[in-house]
């Protein structure tokens, strides 16, 4: 077996795009016959969870592309710039809307990306 360290694997995965990571997960699921789906937990009391969630202000956001709108080419350009994806991958992401463009972004960066996508003609949501 090659002398590849865990750190090298982690470093390689860190540099992958969201689309590449999704493809990797699918391949691993097929190869090992497993599922990456999280197990469903027993639901807690809804009143307590809602109060705690409202008390905490969210500091990381996911930018979700709801639809590309009429100016799909402009939206693809913004997606490419934001994600570093190639043209085909960015087009597939835009065509597959709703799609998460970027995850766990700081609020200011997420709002800036949302603004850029909306200016390009897309419908965007922050989660």
UniProtKB/Swiss-Prot annotation:
CDD domains linked: Ribosomal_L7_L12
Pfam families membership: Ribosomal_L12, Ribosomal_L12_N
Any one cellular-component term (Gene Ontology): cytosolic large ribosomal subunit
Keywords: Ribonucleoprotein, Ribosomal protein
Gene Ontology BP, a term: translation
GO molecular function: mRNA binding; structural constituent of ribosome
PANTHER family, per the entry: 39S RIBOSOMAL PROTEIN L12, LARGE RIBOSOMAL SUBUNIT PROTEIN BL12M
Task of the protein: Forms part of the ribosomal stalk which helps the ribosome interact with GTP-bound translation factors. Is thus essential for accurate translation.
NCBIfam families given in the database record: L12
Subunit-structure text: Homodimer. Part of the ribosomal stalk of the 50S ribosomal subunit. Forms a multimeric L10(L12)X complex, where L10 forms an elongated spine to which 2 to 4 L12 dimers bind in a sequential fashion. Binds GTP-bound translation factors.
Protein family per UniProt: Belongs to the bacterial ribosomal protein bL12 family.
Protein name in the entry: Large ribosomal subunit protein bL12
